[in-house]
Structure formats: C-alpha cells, structure tokens
C-alpha cells in the first residue's frame, strides 16, 4: 500500500484513483499523521506527499521527508516540502501559471524509465523550488521552471513540480508506476 498524505490539494483523490488504475492500493491520510503510525503498518511500501495550497499547514511532511525509511514522492507542494526539509529554497515562480507545460528529462533515472525525454505535463507554478538542496540532483526542467523534478542522490526520495496524476500529463501513470516499482511493486 502507498500512503498519500493529504496536504489539501485539489488532486489528492486523483492520486488515489491513478494508483488504483495501475493496480496499487493506497490510503489517503491527514498530513498530520505521525511518521511512526505510517511506518508501523507493515503493508505500507511508500509515501506520497500531495499538492496543496499552504506550506504552513504541511510542516509534518518535513519531518516525514527527513526521517522516513520508506520511498517518498512529493508532488507540487510535496516536492517543495522535500526541498525545504533538506535545506533547499522555495519561492514564487517567475511565470505564475497553471497549465500544460513541456517537461524535459535531463537525466535517466528510475522515475522516468520508459518516458520520453520530452512530454507534456499539467503543472501549477505559483511557488517552485528555487535552489535544489545539497545531496539532490535535478532530473527534469521546463522552459518556465528549472526544477520540474529532483531526486536525492542516495535515498529513494523524489519530487515533481508537475502533476503526474492528472489525465493531461502524458506518461503520468508510467511515472507513478515507476515510483511504485521503487517501492517494490512488480508490474507485468
């Protein structure tokens, strides 16, 4: 099972449905859920930090990003929370928009296996990662955002600014499936 921490984003239920579509069970929990409670459930194989409107109401996710022993995928706000947890910088986007964006994959990696080097993704660019934390590397960028995706160099921690769970994102299910593979799921 994948635990989805609900940061109040409008697409949290889309994450749940997208995982169900690819055959992975998931559970949406409040973003105040303690890490010990999540990790004490032996069925949990990974954590997704959802998008949301307010960093201040999602501070527990910083503790989870720093201390979880499970793989983590941060989406939009979740991505930004991972950056903050590890000492990166988040700020207002120069091009504040909510639209389809062409994403360019800079580095082959587990998250973008079987995904083209360029694809269209639905993205919210109100805030974004301005500086990648030490120990992380940029995996993808767009013309309006230099950090569309990042990964910790030694831990299975990923962040994406765009929304793989939204139907408009090409290869979104493939990206979610790739994260689930990192968590130990097998697909035919």
Swiss-Prot record:
SUPFAM superfamilies (alphabetical): Class I glutamine amidotransferase-like
Official protein name in the record: GMP synthase [glutamine-hydrolyzing] subunit A
Disulfide bridge partners, by residue number: none
Residue ranges the record marks as coiled coil: none
Active site positions, chain numbering: 76, 163, 165
Glutamine amidotransferase type-1 domain mapped to chain residues: 1-188
GO MF annotation: an example: GMP synthase (glutamine-hydrolyzing) activity
Species of provenance: Methanocaldococcus jannaschii (strain ATCC 43067 / DSM 2661 / JAL-1 / JCM 10045 / NBRC 100440) (Methanococcus jannaschii)
Top-level enzyme category: ligase
Pathway: Purine metabolism; GMP biosynthesis; GMP from XMP (L-Gln route): step 1/1
Entry EC no(s): 6.3.5.2
NCBIfam families registered for this protein in UniProt: guaA_Nterm, PRK00758.1
Catalysed reaction, written as an equation: XMP + L-glutamine + ATP + H2O = GMP + L-glutamate + AMP + diphosphate + 2 H(+)
Record keywords: ATP-binding, Glutamine amidotransferase, GMP biosynthesis, Ligase, Nucleotide-binding, Purine biosynthesis
Known role: Catalyzes the synthesis of GMP from XMP.
Subunit structure, interactors included: Heterodimer composed of a glutamine amidotransferase subunit (A) and a GMP-binding subunit (B).
InterPro entries with a match to the protein in the record: Class_I_gatase-like, GATASE, GMP_synth_GATase, GMP_synthase_A
Superkingdom, natural source: Archaea
